[in-house]
Amino acid sequence: MKIIVDMMGGDNAPLAVLEGAAAAVKEYGVSLIGVGNEELVRKTAAEHNIPLDGIELVNCTETIEMCDEPARAIRSKKDSSIVVGLNLLKEGRGDAFVSAGSTGALHVGASLIVRTLKGVKRPALATMVPAKKQAYLLLDCGANVECRPEMLAAFAVMGSCYVNRVEGRTSPSVALANNGAEESKGTPVLREAHQLLKTTPGIRFVGNIEPRDVPNGEVDVVVCDGFTGNVILKLTEGVAKMLLGMLKEMFLRNLGGKVAYLLLKSGVSDLKHQMDSEEYGGAPFLGAKQPVIKAHGSSKAKGIK
């Protein structure tokens, strides 16, 4: 397998990307194509003693910044790491493209360069989110801020297929994120989407799900627009960090708490491990003709690997 990697994407690029890429080559035996400013990449690798074995470098002179307007950037920055990387994927030079760069640019690029599967209007960004019973697939989690009912139905089909094939779950349950369980709740788009999902073949739609019930992990797939999904995802991350911090502070207040913390430390560590976004690597754009993976913008080496 050969994976194309955006060396310039993310808050910690190119160092974290280089470290993660080198670790992936060593541990998984994959071949990589690193796309980015070759001079900077080689300089960073030399300064930090990072081997470039198994990494073919493709030079680029431009970078799409987080503040750039996605569609304009994809069209104007032809020599950016994202555009070049996606074109390499389209040409068959690699099996997948991974980037921690701009979500919007990746979304537009996946649509315009890689293209979408027949019947899919826009790719959906999907990620597995840890929950009480079991992790669930959340889509869209940040690519399509506004969605029509038929788009949400397409997301449900793609999400159901993904969970079945990748997670091995038979007849996965699909729920629509809404502000109430009743069919009459929500915006006109959500009400129409609910009716459409009830008659969509190939999925097991179980109705609406309220935000308070999402973390229980009772359903396999949660469908929503990208704005709602991104709020759910980031709120989950924030609450997890807050609770872990509060637990630690509570345990360390007195001697009894410290003793209890020592006894429960392995369990707390396991929980922290489950809630760590670095453990989940990247999120695929479902519906693109070829695999395009979005890594967290703040990814460190572990997340990239």
Set out the residue ranges of the language-model regions.
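A short, small-residue-rich loop immediately preceding and capping a beta-strand
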Residues: 5, 94-105, 109
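Short, glycine-rich nucleotide/cofactor-binding loops
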Residues: 5-14, 143-153, 294-303
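Glycine-rich phosphate/diphosphate-binding loop of Rossmann-like nucleotide-binding domains
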Residues: 15-16, 31-33, 39-42, 145-207, ...
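Glycine-rich phosphate/nucleotide-binding loop
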Residues: 111-138, 218-222, 226-305
